[in-house]
Amino acid sequence: VVLISGNHEAAHKMPRALELPDNVRRLATRKPESVDGREIGVRVQDCDVLFHGQGFASATVDENVVQRYPLGRSGAFNIGLLHTSLEATGGEHARYAPCSVSDLVSRQYDYWALGHIHKARVIQAEPPIVFPGNIQGRHIREAGPKGCQLVTVDDRNRPSLEFVPLDVFRWHELTVAADGAKRGDDVLGLIGQSLHRLVRDQGELPLAVRVVVTGCCPAHRTLAAAPEAWANQVRAAAAGAGEVWVEKVKFQTAEVEVAAV
């Protein structure tokens, strides 16, 4: 295992105090470091593997460090590790060790494994530049499957990617269209049906679900008059759907517009 520290590890004392197992190699934070895979028993198709990376000791890094990374070594399979926001300047994840895709490509590596962004994204296919994301969703903004990328290298040193789920608990936002529903109980029935379908289709893991009810319906006033009471009924209905926890219920319905006579 080769790892680098990012902003979360730099900001907290506990990860720095943990004693790592003998098979784990943590890369330096002062400057980029290269590790020959032979030192840790790693080879690919009888080809040498080199890991290039730098961890960070600070929770805030504004510097582009990529140009300090060494060029990839010819004849070896070169893997780059970097904790970075790329060129992003806003959104959920703060700007961190910013760089461009062209900066990464200039190092002539065969694979870039990036951290910091929690959503899995393949930024570029050739050479692969990949955010595997985090391995467990922590809240509704991290919905969907979470895991890692399994990288297989063929006899021509060409990598192929396969996403492997690792999460043990999955978040999901469930939108239920209640258009035309006349009564609150009708809406409950629609939600119950949707929850059962969700568990049937994605129920290999326990689910945490945010239910969003939309649409124009006569039941709107009934729902709007006591939203928390109806939300509790949704939670009770979910108990019969399987391993589902309803995190929140949001009623975004509207009254039916009556055409002027």
Q: PLM features: residue spans?
A:
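His/Asp/Glu-rich metal-coordinating catalytic cores
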Residues: 1-160
